[in-house]
Structure formats: structure tokens, C-alpha cells
Amino acid sequence: TLSLHDALPIFAAALKALRAENISTKVFNSGLGISVFRDNSTRTRFSYASALNLLGLAQQDLDEGKSQIAHGETVRETANMISFCADAIGIRDDMYLGAGNAYMREVGAALDDGYKQGVLPQRPALVNLQCDIDHPTQSMADLAWLREHFGSLENLKGKKIAMTWAYSPSYGKPLSVPQGIIGLMTRFGMDVTLAHPEGYDLIPDVVEVAKNNAKASGGSFRQVTSMEEAFKDADIVYPKSWAPYKVMEERTELLRANDHEGLKALEKQCLAQNAQHKDWHCTEEMMELTRDGEA
């Protein structure tokens, strides 16, 4: 029996093949997929709308500021109400560390209870479009591409992937992308290296998940503070900037307090910290360190 993580890339490949041959992939003859974006989005917003359309669902965005939520309606009430009209609900909530994933679980629990109590005729699918912990739609898309590139999920075993911090002239980028990658790729027996300058740590619990996944899958997980070391003999490299875990904690407190001056001071501090690591950059010389220079 295939696990969900094994089945999804295969299902995605089947949909891609059907779409390429202009064969209908519509599972639904009608229906609605609702999106709730509590942070800005471009790529995920359009890819979610495209996916809904591919399956036969129309897309409707919920603007919480224009809904009854703005008048005090609870999460439970809103979740159940819109679920009468929906087959899927996608949520992005990544701004506040410790809140986004918890909110999604609260919505999920409300839907479970609504269906159990007979309030809802069906329980809509809940899609995490990025939270403070994970970005599963992106990491699963990355996994699907790796499966296509290397031929199968089985062929990913033993492949070395370097998830590395990279310099960016901005700050406050979420932890969810690198966390999603180390949490997912360690499930498939890959040798996963997480590289970042000292102090740019991820959420400790997620790192523990990656370690445990690697042990269970026969892969490996290690952390280094050298981009060169991570790139050496890597089959896949994934350079990505992110803010340190401690900074994201402080940023969350400032955002909640609506402390604009504090946010400006934190940004200035973090940009100066980032500037100390401009050598963390994916160059041609760095790529030559990868396996046969062809990662």
C-alpha cells in the first residue's frame, strides 16, 4: 500500500500527463475551492487557483476584513459556514511564529466536529498553502520534480541534497521553506545537509523531526556552517534565504504589538547581520563542487 507521500507525486505526474494530452482532469463537475490568504502571495495564489480549475472547482478568495469575522464571528462559525459551499479550503498563514499552523489545526478541528455533529454534509479538504512551520505545497512540488528528474522515488535514496542559507538583501523571509524541505526529503532515504551561518537556526522541533525521519528511512541528516561543505558532491542544491529563528520570534512579538519603530530597528540589525555573509552565494565556482559539477 502506498503512503500518501508516495502516492501524491505519482498522482501529480498522471495529472500532468493528461493535461499535456489535453485530456480532461476534472474530478468535479461543479463546486468551490476557497482560499484564505492572511499574507501576501503570488505564485501560491495562482498555482492553487490553477489546481482547483484543473480538478473542476471554481476558486473564491475569502477576504476576512470583508466577512463576518471582522464583526466577531468565531473561527468555528466561519469555518463551518463556508464549508457548506466548499470542497476545499486553502489557507496561507505564515506571518506569526507559533500561530499559523495552530490556526489551521483549529479550522481543521472545527470542520471535523461540524461533520461529526451532522452540521456539515461533508468535510472539505484543508490545504496548507504555507504556515509558520511548513510550506507543503511547495516542498511536494519539489519532490514531484525530483521524482521526474531521477526516474522514481526509490531512486532518491542515497541522493545528497544541500538545503543551504543564501544571502539576500532583505530580511524576515519565512522558515517554512527550508523546514519543509528537510522535513520531507528525509522521509525518502536521502542524505540531507542543512547549511547556514551560525545563528541562523530553524525551529528546533522541526530539526528533530528531520533527524528522526532520516533514521527511519535509512537516510541521513546533518547540519554544517559551511556552504562549500554542503555543496561538495551534492546531487541537488537548494539555496534559500531565511531569517534566524530567534529573529522571527522577536519579529512576531513586534508585529503583534504593532511596534513599527521596533520593526525598523530589527530590520536594520538583521540586514547588517545578513551583510556579513554575502559570500553565501550560489556561484559557478560553488556549483563546480557538486557531484560532477552537474547538480
Task: Give, region by region, the residue ranges found by the protein language model.
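Short, small-residue-biased leader/transition segments that mark boundaries at the very start
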Residues: 1-8
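Structural alpha-helical scaffold elements that stabilize or flank donor/cofactor-binding regions
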Residues: 6, 82, 229-230
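Immediate post-signal peptide segment of exported/extracytoplasmic ligand-binding proteins
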Residues: 19-31, 155-158
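Phosphate/diphosphate ligand-binding glycine-rich loop within oxidoreductases
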Residues: 26-36, 40-147
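Glycine-rich phosphate/diphosphate-binding loop of Rossmann-like nucleotide-binding domains
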Residues: 38-50, 147-260
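Charged helix-capping and loop-helix junction motifs
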Residues: 73-77, 175-180, 254, 278-282
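A short helix->loop->beta-strand "cap" motif at the edges of active sites that frequently abuts
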Residues: 117-124, 190, 289-295
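Glycine-rich phosphate/nucleotide-binding loop
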Residues: 240-295
